[in-house]
Amino acid sequence: SVDAAKYMLAAGRILRGDFDSEKDLLVKSDPDSAGPIVFADFEDGTYGKWLSTGTAFGKGPVTLETKAEYQKDVRPHGKFFVNSHNVRLSGKTPSSGSADDQLGSLTSPRFRIERDFITFLVGGGAYKKETCVNLLVDGKVVLSATGRSNNTMTETGWDVRRWRGSEARIQVVDKRKGGWGNIGLDHIV
């Protein structure tokens, strides 16, 4: 079972944006728990079995070298990360506005929720339902997170105990054109 004090501490850290999955996620859901599961980190340089629609996410994850220079320090975990601020379309670096005008979604394959928490890095626009990361259960959005109108990805997390054992998908959404019309994601645990 989850220690109430540890849970409250982790919840406060999520709200402050300083949740650390390497440390905080090690709160086991039961004595037989094997610890965190890295669901996706994109370190093979592809989206794998994720379904990409539209033009926002390009053909694969970006690196610090291939993202727009003006996005500054996005703080990914590892080399590759998801970023819908698509400057890859023509081989040129378009203006910030045109890169933010690309729309699309990226949806994971189905998976079974096996732990009490899901954490990830997220950055980009702070527009609910428009630039967000969603947890889908039975095809419906049950939890959602946005960036903070900042390209620097911060760790956030969801308490998913309610859906433990359920099949789910993670969906990254970019439905917004213009300033902060982008979303970044990395290291889903």
What kind of feature is each model-predicted range?
Residues 42, 117-124, 168-174:
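Extracellular beta-strand-rich recognition modules
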Residues 135-183:
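Extracellular carbohydrate recognition and processing domains
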Residues 32-33, 38-41, 176-189:
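Extracellular polysaccharide-targeting segments
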Residues 86-117, 127-130, 153-157:
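Short beta-strands within extracellular/lumenal beta-sheet-rich domains
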